Regions:
Chain B
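H-loop (His-switch) and adjacent beta-strand-loop-beta switch element
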Residues: 214-226
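ABC-family P-loop ATPase nucleotide-binding domain
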Residues: 1-13, 224-231
Length: 378, 231
């Protein structure tokens, strides 16, 4: 079998024009599919960045919340009620909101403010400069070193700014796992300072972060919170809710889906058509092989090998090209959101296999129909 | 001489009902090891259809074909493919060489189909290219060869698996007179042996002198088999 596959390989790659056209079709399709889905994955990860960075196992929120940036304040009694639920190890308040800071050069810059529980600082980021205790100092804020920090003029420890006529000072620089979707720099402070500095409605708790005593307690906590008229979600459930919002309620997911389908069809039509032409041009040769003594299944193996080989090379080139462009884009535009996930790679791989299967199916049908007698007859 | 091929009452038709046309009708003949048998006749007389049935390519509607005492049409499709691979060598009218493979790789195809090691197959192919006088062209693409050279590559491919039965379809149709005669000299003197039977379908009366016997066909029937006086 190895020998006949080698013949198939040589027939394929020695026909440089056709082979290049086949590769271009599949590479293009894979590139577009992976690129589209990676951009969407990047957006989804960024949209859940607060949830990822704070790391709480459970989040309590108003049932109308559909993404982490649009919190609906909770009454203080909900915090007490959640703390009293059996199975809750601890529960802390979180302030999450937006504000305008005035920089020393007079420019106003919108920022995201996260106010951590004063007692536990639960969800605090990892500091790369400064000490976490300094967050309790007067006017203290910790800035996140991400793609957006340059919008604050690349602050260092000691940099001052104004926030609603309050003086603010950077006491630490932190790093986090994911930066936000909306291109805003992030400042951490304590919960009490956040509600003091930022004009707030009657209720000030954006979310309650919960640590259950055990994984088994999660269901009970969720049902008890539901009885209070609120919603408790695990970290994964909350991220899924946010993802669903962007997928189904913003039109973004539908557009990406359409673009992915179009990419698939473009790739299928280019490579399918080229492969079909390749088979047609070699049809007499396949017939001659049959006449010489090749069995039908050997010809099928040859065609499947050619299709699979082209698909795999095209897949590799497409993924490589996509990663290269994402890397280059991130160098030029740091906040560019695109993430190649294993799920995306697996999806594109399945799609490319489908392209190869459909293309080879057409070829196989043709080759199996050719009769050696037709070759003999000329 | 031993009987290589024994065809009995071979019939093949195409179409059904009023449209049924007989390509070959009740043809019987024997061919022997060590002889060159020409099948001649006008276009549409059934020569190619007859050879296709004898070589395991086209199933007859009735009649039997015994090759080396085996009724080939009682075999399964896979066994018939094996039969063609092991017992029959074809030289097609248009050669059907693969332009994307080297000359040696083209010749090695039957051995590769027989699952022989690639390198060994290429070595054997080069030996047969040497036999047909083309060893120095082994690494060239067939398109770089002349018509006569391509014909010899096709002959080397037909020979490489050492078949008992060699079938040539119009071997000189696209060659000039001199080249055609040289090819036939080569077939007669170097290819034919006592354990091989060669069947040649041709229109070309210039090469009839190389036949041991000539079978004439008209309208799907045999109209006579003549033995050449000088053979």
């Amino acid at each position: 079998m190895k020998g006949i596959l080698k013949i198939a390989f040589k027939l394929l790659v020695n026909d440089k024009g056709k082979y290049a056209a086949l590769l271009v079709g599949i590479t293009f399709a894979v590139f577009l599919m992976v690129q589209m889905i990676s951009i969407f994955s990047g957006i989804l990860i960024k949209s859940s960045s607060t949830v990822i960075n704070l790391g709480a196992d459970m989040w309590v929120m108003d049932p109308a919340v559909n993404n982490v940036a649009s919190s609906i304040p909770l009454p203080d009694y909900v915090l007490d009620a959640v703390r009293s639920i059996e199975g809750v190890n601890y529960a802390v308040p979180l302030y999450s909101g937006a504000a305008l800071v005035k920089l020393r050069n007079g420019i106003f810059q919108p920022v995201t403010i996260l106010g951590l529980d004063d007692h536990s600082l639960f969800g605090r980021p990892e500091l790369i400069e400064g000490e976490i205790e300094d967050i309790y100092a007067e006017n203290a804020f910790i800035v996140v070193q991400d793609a957006e920090v340059r919008k604050l003029g690349h602050p260092t420890v000691g940099t001052e700014f104004e926030l609603n006529d309050h003086r603010g000072v950077i006491v630490g620089i932190a790093k986090v796992g994911a930066s936000g979707l909306f291109g805003l720099p992030t400042l951490y402070t304590t919960y009490s300072k956040a509600i003091q500095y930022i004009p707030s409605p009657r209720f000030t708790i954006s979310y309650i972060l919960v640590e259950p005593k055990s994984p088994e307690a999660v269901t009970h906590i969720e049902s008890e919170v539901r009885r209070l008229g609120y919603l408790a979600l695990t970290k994964d459930e909350f991220m899924e809710k946010i993802a669903n919002f962007y997928k189904y309620q913003t039109g973004l997911g539908t557009n990406i889906l359409i673009m992915t389908a179009v990419s698939f069809l473009v790739g299928l039509s280019i490579s399918g058509q080229t492969f079909y032409t390749f088979i047609l041009e070699n049809l007499e040769k396949f017939g001659a092989l049959k006449a010489i003594g090749a069995k039908g299944r050997e010809l099928i193996y040859m065609i499947l090998f050619q299709a699979a080989f082209t698909a795999l090379v095209g897949y590799g080139l497409g993924v490589g090209l996509c990663v290269l462009i994402i890397v280059l884009a991130k160098i030029r535009v740091p906040e560019y959101s695109a993430t190649v996930t294993f799920t995306t790679l697996a999806f594109a791989f399945v799609m490319v296999l489908i392209i190869a299967a459909i293309s080879s199916y057409i070829g196989i049908r043709k080759v199996l129909k050719i009769e050696p007698f037709d070759i003999f007859r000329g | 001489m031993d009987t290589a091929i024994s065809a009995k009452e071979l019939t093949k038709w195409f179409g059904e009902g009023d449209l049924r046309t007989y390509a070959v009708k009740e043809v019987s003949f024997d061919a022997y090891f060590g002889e060159i048998l020409f099948v001649v006749g006008p276009s549409g007389s059934g020569k190619t259809t007859l050879l296709s049935m004898i070589s395991g390519i086209l199933r007859p509607d009735s009649g039997t074909v015994n090759v080396d005492h085996v009724d080939i049409w009682s075999l399964t499709p896979d066994q018939i493919a094996e039969f063609r691979l092991n017992k029959v060598g074809f030289v097609f009218q248009d050669y059907h060489l693969f332009p994307r493979l080297t000359t040696a790789e083209n010749v090695a195809i039957p051995l590769i189909l027989k699952k022989k090691d690639w390198n060994e197959s290429i070595r054997d192919a080069e030996h047969y290219l040497d036999v047909v006088g083309l060893k120095n062209k082994a690494q060239l693409a067939p398109v770089k060869l002349s018509g006569g050279e391509q014909q010899r590559v096709a002959i080397a491919r037909a020979l490489v698996a050492q078949p008992d039965l060699l079938i040539f379809d119009e071997p000189t149709a696209s060659l000039d007179g001199d080249t055609g005669r040289r090819i036939m000299e080569f077939v007669k003197n170097r290819i034919l042996n006592d354990s091989r039977c060669i069947l040649i379908v041709t229109h070309d009366s210039r090469i009839f002198e190389y036949a041991d016997r000539i079978m004439r066909m008209e309208d799907g029937k045999t109209v006579g088999i003549e033995k050449r006086a000088d053979h």
